[in-house]
C-alpha cells in the first residue's frame, strides 16, 4: 500500500541523514585544506562582521518578506523546496511564530573578503537567520531555525491536460499546479521546541515522521557557485 511505502521511505531517509551529515563534514574539512571555507557566522573576524552588517542592511533587509502567524494572521504559502527562517516570538497569549523567506532573488552564496587564493563564504539564509531579530523588530526571539518544505510532485499529466491549450501552456499549468501540491517533507536545520514544531505540523498537515533535522545546508545546490569561483 502507498502509505506503507511512504512510511518505509521516511524511515530509510532518517537512517541516511547521519551518513549525509558525516560525509558533508569530511568534505568541508578537505576543502579547508584547499583554502575553501564555509564560515561559521558566529565565529567571524571583526572585518567579516562589518562586511556582513553592511551587506545585510543594503542587499538583504530591504527585500525581505516577513510574516507573523497568530490568531489574527493566516499561515503563508510556503513554496516548494524554498528555504525559510522560522522563529518563535515571545507572546503572552497564543503561540506566535515568525517566518522569513530566504529566496527573494537573493544571491545564495555570499563570498567574504579574503586573501588571494582563499575562498571564504556563508549562505544568505544563515545571514537572514542570524539577523532574524531585525526582521521582527519589537519582538523578542525565543528560538529560531531554518526550514524547507518539499511538496508532492506526483501529478496526473493526462488528467491535467487541456486540449485547447498548446503543449507549452499545458506544461506551464502543470508545473504551477505541482508547486502548490500538499507538503510531504519538512527539513529543519536544528531541533525546535514542541510548541513551534506542532504549530508547523498542524499548519502543513504533516506528521513527526515527515520531519528531518539535518546539520548540512538544507539545499546543496549552492556548491556549483563555489565550484565556479574556484575554477575561474
Language model: regions and residue ranges:
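Conserved catalytic alpha/beta cores of large enzymes that bind or transform nucleotide phosphates
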Residues: 122-194
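Extended, H/D-rich, highly charged conserved domains that either
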Residues: 186-204, 210-224
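Extended, charge-enriched "interface" segments that sit outside catalytic cores
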Residues: 1-41
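Extended, Lys/Arg-enriched charged tracts that mediate electrostatic binding to polyanionic substrates
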Residues: 51-97
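Conserved small/polar residues in nucleotide/adenosyl-binding loops
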Residues: 230-231
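Extended active-site and interfacial segments that coordinate phosphate-rich ligands
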Residues: 95-137, 166, 214-216
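Long alpha-helical segments found as membrane-embedded helices
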Residues: 1, 38, 49, 58-62, ...
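Charged, compositionally biased non-catalytic regions
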Residues: 29-64
Amino acid at each position: 500500500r502507498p502509505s506503507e511505502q511512504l512510511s518505509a521511505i521516511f524511515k530509510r531517509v532518517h537512517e541516511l541523514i547521519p551518513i549525509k551529515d558525516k560525509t558533508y563534514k569530511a568534505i568541508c574539512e578537505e576543502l579547508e585544506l584547499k583554502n575553501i571555507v564555509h564560515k561559521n557566522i558566529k565565529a567571524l573576524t571583526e572585518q567579516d562582521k562589518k562586511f556582513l552588517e553592511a551587506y545585510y542592511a543594503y542587499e538583504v533587509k530591504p527585500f525581505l518578506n516577513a510574516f507573523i502567524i497568530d490568531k489574527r494572521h493566516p499561515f503563508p504559502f510556503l513554496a516548494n523546496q524554498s528555504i525559510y527562517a522560522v522563529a518563535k516570538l515571545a507572546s503572552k497569549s497564543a503561540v506566535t511564530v515568525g517566518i522569513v523567506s530566504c529566496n527573494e532573488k537573493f544571491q545564495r552564496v555570499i563570498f567574504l573578503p579574503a586573501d588571494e587564493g582563499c575562498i571564504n563564504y556563508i549562505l544568505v539564509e544563515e545571514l537572514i537567520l542570524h539577523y532574524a531579530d531585525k526582521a521582527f523588530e519589537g519582538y523578542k526571539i525565543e528560538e529560531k531555525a531554518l526550514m524547507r518544505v518539499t511538496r508532492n510532485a506526483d501529478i496526473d499529466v493526462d488528467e491535467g491536460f487541456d486540449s485547447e491549450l498548446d503543449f507549452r501552456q499545458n506544461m506551464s499549468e502543470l508545473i504551477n499546479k505541482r508547486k502548490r501540491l500538499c507538503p510531504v517533507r519538512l527539513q529543519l536545520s536544528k531541533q525546535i521546541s514542541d510548541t513551534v514544531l506542532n504549530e508547523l505540523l498542524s499548519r502543513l498537515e504533516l506528521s513527526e515522521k515527515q520531519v528531518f533535522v539535518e546539520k548540512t545546508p538544507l539545499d546543496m545546490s549552492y556548491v556549483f557557485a563555489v565550484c565556479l569561483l574556484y575554477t575561474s
